């Protein structure tokens, strides 16, 4: 085996069981990784300088193919209702087969950090079969200084082999695709998928497992910081506006996806962004658009013209989940440290396609925990499913696939931190108003931004409020610059009876979903549930 690049020879591939490799390319930077990816036919060069790769049959994550080793260390720690389990023996066979599959191959290794706060960061070493995967994860995680690589000792090892195919009978998995996490031995194996997001989410999953033990709250959220040092968190599932709304020219961007909240404040887990590009426009999101025209950015499943190499961000023929991955410094107003003080505001974003939630509501600590555990949004059902109306989605903690522990662990941590630091909490509906999908309209972005500005500058906390008769939370009666009727969802509907019926239906969905958490929360959180006595 020959080595190319800088690394700590005392912690070589043998520490991960890897042997008889052809070559290992250590900690290569973007120019070298471009050369390797292009020479190997892994990717193409776009007109603006970005590297463009396709992921094949997997154009998104494979949550049903993700497994955690169930052993004495994890038996009572992992939420097994939400996490697939394999035995240590099955993992041993899988690992042995990964090692055998890697023999004679070139691998690319990156030594990186997950976590901008040194006291809580994890040193993640990522071995990849593809050069473009190596560039992707280098963009997404935090890059150590060059002179630190010689002494780098990994805490977590990820082996990413897209050409490996798992054997369900032998390995105890579901298909040829596998993401297997051994928290005890600190190894993650990814096989059968070229979707690069599996790597970053594996680091996130590991941090979500280890940090609560240290009293640190891991969060699937974006974050930004105001001119006075006031930080804000934005929770939200895909399509709710998490990336767009946190990317505010008047505030410093801390990060777009994963953060921790510890004794000193909040910190980014990552050193880059993984933004959706479908229907991306220069006018609507100029900062993100500009990254697609830069050398160093990786674009995933974006269609490019074979002659001009210009990207077509409106083309969803490969997938709706087209992405670009770039280092945070590519965003002009990004934080240089990835750290900030304790948040002053928490915003929980939902895209309510039923059109019955108000555009903003102020939450108590108990209500914030209720809605955090619920993790509600709604999506418009695709015609291929034959559904005419919206489809409710409840993803606890706004990121159920990445949460190894029971949601109450994260919910209690969040509630304690909210109380300790006197954080104002808000529920913001970026979905529909005046009716649901088909009869109403999307909440105007100018309204959402005006409401967020008022929430983040502190003025909205002093407003007059009414109690929502269906969902129980406090809704402002007026906000300067916002039409008063839009704050009263029922007033935006022409058919008041249809509004009442739709609101009642959504209330029932909340109640049915929350039954699984009732035994794990205090009475005041149970009391924060939407009130059917009025909705009936």
From Swiss-Prot:
Q: Identify which cofactors the protein needs according to its UniProt entry.
A: Mn(2+)
Give the primary localization class: cytoplasm
State which pathway it belongs to: Carbohydrate biosynthesis; gluconeogenesis
Q: For binding ATP, which residues are annotated in this chain's numbering?
A: 201, 220, 236-244, 285, 323, 448
Query: GO cellular component terms?
Result: cytosol
InterPro entries according to UniProt: PEP_carboxykinase_ATP, PEP_carboxykinase_C, PEP_carboxykinase_N
Note the superkingdom of the native organism. Bacteria
> What Pfam family is a match for this entry?
PEPCK_ATP
- Statement: the UniProt record of this protein carries the keyword Metal-binding: yes
Q: Which residues bind Mn(2+)?
A: 201, 220, 257
Which controlled-vocabulary keywords does the entry list? ATP-binding, Cytoplasm, Decarboxylase, Gluconeogenesis, Lyase, Manganese, Metal-binding, Nucleotide-binding
The record's cofactor note says: Binds 1 Mn(2+) ion per subunit.
What's a single GO MF annotation on this record?
Answer: phosphoenolpyruvate carboxykinase (ATP) activity
Q: Which GO terms describe its biological process?
A: gluconeogenesis
Q: What class of enzyme is it?
A: lyase
User: What is this enzyme's EC?
Assistant: 4.1.1.49
Functional note:
Involved in the gluconeogenesis. Catalyzes the conversion of oxaloacetate (OAA) to phosphoenolpyruvate (PEP) through direct phosphoryl transfer between the nucleoside triphosphate and OAA.
**NCBIfam families of this UniProt entry?**
pckA, PRK09344.1-2, PRK09344.1-3, PRK09344.1-4
Regarding protein family, the annotation reads:
Belongs to the phosphoenolpyruvate carboxykinase (ATP) family.
The name this protein goes by in its record: Phosphoenolpyruvate carboxykinase (ATP)
- The gene from which this protein is expressed is pckA
């Amino acid at each position: 085996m020959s080595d190319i690049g800088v690394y700590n020879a005392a912690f070589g591939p043998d520490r991960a069981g890897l042997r008889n490799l052809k070559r290992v390319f250590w900690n290569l930077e973007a120019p070298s990784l471009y050369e390797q990816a292009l020479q190997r036919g892994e990717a193409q060069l776009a007109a603006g300088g970005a590297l463009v790769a396709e992921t094949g049959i997997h154009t998104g994550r494979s949550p049903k193919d993700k497994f955690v080793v169930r052993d004495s260390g994890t038996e009572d720690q992992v939420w097994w209702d939400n996490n697939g389990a394999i035995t240590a023996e099955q993992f041993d066979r899988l690992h042995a087969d990964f090692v055998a599959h890697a023999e004679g191959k070139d691998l690319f290794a990156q030594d990186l950090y997950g976590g901008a706060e040194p006291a809580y960061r994890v040193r993640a070493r990522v071995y990849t079969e593809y050069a473009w995967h190596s560039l992707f994860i280098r963009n997404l995680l935090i890059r150590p200084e060059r002179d630190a690589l010689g002494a780098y000792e990994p805490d977590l090892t990820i082996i990413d082999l897209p050409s490996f195919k798992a054997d369900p009978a032998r390995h105890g998995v579901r298909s040829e695709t596998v993401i297997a996490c051994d928290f005890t031995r600190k190894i993650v194996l990814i096989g059968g998928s070229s979707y690069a997001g599996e790597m970053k989410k594996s680091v996130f999953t590991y941090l979500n497992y280890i940090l609560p033990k240290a009293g640190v709250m891991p969060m699937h959220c974006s974050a930004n910081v105001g001119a006075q040092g006031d930080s804000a968190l934005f929770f939200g599932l895909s399509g709710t506006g998490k990336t767009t709304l946190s990317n505010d020219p008047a505030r410093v961007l801390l990060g777009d996806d994963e953060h921790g909240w510890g004794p000193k404040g909040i910190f980014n887990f990552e050193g880059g962004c993984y933004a959706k590009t479908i229907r991306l426009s220069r006018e609507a999101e100029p900062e993100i658009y500009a990254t697609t025209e830069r050398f160093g950015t990786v674009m995933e499943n974006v269609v490019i013209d074979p002659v001009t190499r210009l990207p077509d961000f409106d083309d969803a023929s490969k997938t709706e989940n087209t992405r670009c991955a770039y280092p945070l410094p590519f965003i002009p107003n990004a934080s240089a440290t990835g750290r900030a003080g304790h948040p002053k505001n928490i915003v929980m974003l939902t895209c309510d396609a039923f059109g019955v939630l108000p555009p903003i509501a102020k939450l108590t600590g108990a209500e914030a925990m209720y809605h955090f555990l619920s993790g509600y949004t709604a999506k418009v059902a695709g015609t291929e499913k034959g559904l005419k109306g919206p489809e409710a989605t409840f993803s606890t903690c706004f990121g159920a696939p990445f949460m190894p522990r029971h949601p109450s662990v994260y919910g209690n941590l969040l509630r304690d931190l909210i109380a300790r630091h006197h954080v104002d909490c808000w529920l913001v509906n970026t979905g529909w108003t005046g009716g649901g999908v088909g009869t109403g309209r999307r909440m105007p972005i100018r309204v959402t931004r005006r409401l967020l500005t008022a929430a983040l500058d502190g003025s909205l906390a002093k407003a007059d409020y009414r109690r929502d008769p269906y969902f129980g939370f406090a809704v402002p009666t007026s906000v300067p610059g916002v039409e008063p009727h839009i704050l009263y969802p029922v007033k935006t509907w022409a058919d008041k009876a249809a509004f009442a019926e739709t609101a009642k239906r959504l209330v029932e969905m909340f109640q049915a979903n929350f039954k699984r958490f009732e035994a794990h929360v205090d009475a005041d959180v149970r009391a924060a549930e939407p009130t059917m006595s009025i909705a009936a």
